[in-house]
Amino acid sequence: MRGGYRIVICSPVGRKQNLAVLFPIIESMKGWIDEYRIWMNCRDPMDMVYCLEFAKKHPGWVTIVHGEKPYTFDMINFISFYANCHDENTIYIKIDDDICYIRNLEGLVDETIAHPERLFVFPYIVNNFWCQILKGQDFLIPDTDKDFAARWKADMDKEKYKIKTLPRDMFIPKALKLDFFPRTMWGDGRYTVILHDHFLNTKEDTSKWSFPEFTTIDDLIAVSINMVAWRGSNWKKYNVQITTEEDETYFTVRLPYELGVFNGFAANTTAAHYSFYPQKEILDQTDILDRYSKLR
């Protein structure tokens, strides 16, 4: 419990390679986290065994939740997990299995409690291009991606009126013909190695790697939901029901537009996201994940 709220962490899993780093981080916060839900989506039997063994270590605290179609890399599976995330007096935090560092999770919870007017609240996330862009970290933005934010915002502003007419199963950026990913920041693992290395070498400078105060996201921008918190009461209030749509743009574009309720970044809290799938092959050839594992 924290601030009178039950705290539930949910992780779509999973890959043992990543979970070997994430599970000890979550385990270290067991004293105030009320429940850890493992959203089981393993495709490798050994990964599944690893998750089940972890759950066995923590009876009554870890809950295994199975998807509708075990076990595929399928959006239908992802979105089915959200069905039971709307209890009153509960703060939910979705933490992807490739989050490899968390600082001040309590701050993320406190900011979510303090800002009931915000639907979703994010920490600053390393390797989440909108965080680097909105933080104004030009030195981290490759020349190929310098104009990405301006193009996205201009195109979205011009096309957003169409959102309410789009079918619920349609990927919004594709439907609106938006350039969804910055080419280098999302797709080039060489850039990601440099980014993680820089963070690992300078992470003690927390002002560099977090927002100094709560920051409202007042544009329709598709922040990657590698880690995000919400109030169950808000989901009930706004009747949030995700059934067929890709979750990322549903949470960050469609709902803010339809409801007029914007998201935000918590102050002084940080997470590191290991990789988007195009980055993984190159990252796995380095010692980056091993360096994160040694931080605990």
Language-model features, listed with the residues they occupy:
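Short alpha-helix within the catalytic core of nucleotide-sugar-dependent glycosyltransferases
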Residues: 23, 89, 100-113, 161, ...
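A conserved hydrophobic helix/loop-capping motif in glycosyltransferases and polysaccharide synthases
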Residues: 7-16
